[in-house]
């Protein structure tokens, strides 16, 4: 009896050892997910390529980690502003030539341009690895999709403590601000510069302003109407204007971290203790699968790698394409100590998550902004 037991142990031992090489015994078959994964990787290697249209989180150091793991898949990136890339994808689809396999950018571009343009397949069906499928590893114990069907637009970032309002440190005392309403005090009339508010680049900030129960449409009217900000399409240029002291405050400036490191007098207002709480934003961190993309298996491999612990740790290691600090992943089972303090979620703090699907419709807020802009033009006339 002792010999039989020992033999069983030996069989089990060798069964485990041979799992990666193929089953020796009937009970040693690979789990279904692993069979699917290995077939997908093999098919991706045959495709040999992945076309990735990506915004700010397409830095080479980050993507090189994927290239090291899957050298047989040539990762080709097209970088640019989210709305520009989204429009390009739609144009390519309508011309009959689908080039992009995956898109990563702002949730608003994903929803307003690609989802509404019926350009997306279900990214949910590409998830294979158990560690990616396990929703308990993610913020609030669930995957976040911003589309109504909960399957097309996967949000992988939850960035807190970003007010989106920047200031010239020589002209503004940040201690003046205890609430968002302090930003629209009459004293700031004519002292703002802002990104053009009708573009999707300000979408996350506009969602927060519009849908927050303590702010709403009245706040937007005061900001873009009463205060009469100067508008610009080039976000680097408006950052330069802020640094030069032409304006005291800015909405939607970009590359301020880099400018600050160069000794320029710019910084972002810290809203960590403001009355209305903190915005939780995707910060350009949502991903979608393009319908009819030429390399569907390579796309599946990348999605699973990127959403795995390895991929999301890599995401948190590197600054984005604009030099801004690495973002906070919605994965909660990975270290957060490499993040700057302002990008870490604070236990007990109040967060307003704009990636909730009920806030996805941008139409009412953009209509409001267009009305404000029209009224401004009429005043000039």
What are the residue ranges of the model-derived segments?
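Periplasmic-binding protein-like
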Residues: 220-225, 229-232, 236, 265-293, ...
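Mature extracytoplasmic/periplasmic domains
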Residues: 285-354
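Short, polar/charged alpha-helical segment
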Residues: 34-45, 49-51, 55-74, 260
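Short, low-complexity disordered leader/linker segments with a strong preference
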Residues: 1-47, 379-381
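Extracytoplasmic ligand-binding site segments that recognize negatively charged/polar headgroups
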Residues: 53-64, 76-90, 98-246, 261
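Non-transmembrane alpha-helical segments in soluble domains
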Residues: 90, 111, 115, 181-184, ...
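Conserved C-terminal helix/tail region of periplasmic/extracytoplasmic solute-binding proteins
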Residues: 27, 33, 345-381
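Bilobed periplasmic-binding protein-like "clamshell/Venus-flytrap" ligand-binding domains
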Residues: 49-52, 154, 193, 308-319
């Amino acid at each position: 009896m002792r010999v039989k037991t020992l033999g069983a142990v030996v069989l089990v031992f060798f069964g485990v050892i041979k799992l990666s090489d193929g089953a020796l015994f009937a009970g040693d078959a690979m789990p279904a997910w692993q069979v699917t994964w290995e077939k997908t990787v093999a098919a991706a290697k045959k495709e040999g390529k992945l076309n990735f249209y990506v915004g700010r989180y397409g830095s080479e150091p980050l993507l090189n980690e994927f290239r090291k793991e899957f050298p047989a898949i040539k990762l080709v990136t097209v970088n640019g502003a989210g709305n520009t890339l989204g429009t390009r994808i739609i144009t390519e689809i309508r011309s009959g030539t689908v080039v992009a396999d995956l898109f990563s950018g702002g949730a608003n571009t994903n929803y307003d341009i690609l989802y509404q343009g019926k350009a997306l397949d279900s990214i949910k069906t590409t998830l294979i690895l158990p560690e990616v499928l396990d929703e308990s590893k993610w913020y609030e114990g669930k995957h976040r999709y911003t589309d109504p069907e909960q399957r097309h637009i996967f949000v992988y970032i939850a960035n807190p403590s970003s007010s989106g309002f920047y200031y010239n440190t020589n002209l503004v005392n940040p201690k003046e601000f205890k609430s968002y309403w302090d930003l629209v005090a009459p004293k700031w009339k004519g002292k703002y510069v802002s990104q053009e508010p009708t573009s999707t680049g300000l979408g996350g900030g506009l969602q927060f302003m519009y849908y927050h129960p303590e702010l709403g449409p009245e706040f937007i009217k005061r900001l873009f109407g009463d205060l009469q900000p100067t508008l610009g399409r080039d976000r680097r240029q408006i950052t330069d204007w802020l640094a030069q002291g032409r304006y005291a405050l800015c909405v939607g400036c970009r590359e301020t971290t880099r400018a600050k490191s160069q000794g320029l007098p710019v910084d972002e207002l810290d809203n960590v203790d403001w009355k209305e709480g903190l915005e939780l934003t995707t910060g350009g961190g949502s991903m979608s699968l393009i319908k009819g993309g030429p390399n569907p298996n390579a796309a599946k491999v990348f999605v699973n790698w990127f959403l795995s612990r390895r991929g999301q740790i890599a995401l948190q290691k590197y600054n984005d394409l604009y030099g801004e600090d690495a973002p906070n992943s919605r994965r909660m089972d990975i270290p957060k100590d490499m993040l700057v303090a302002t990008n870490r979620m604070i236990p007990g703090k109040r967060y307003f998550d704009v990636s909730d699907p009920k806030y996805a419709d941008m139409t009412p807020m953009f209509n409001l902004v267009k009305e404000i802009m029209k009224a401004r033009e009429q005043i000039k006339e």
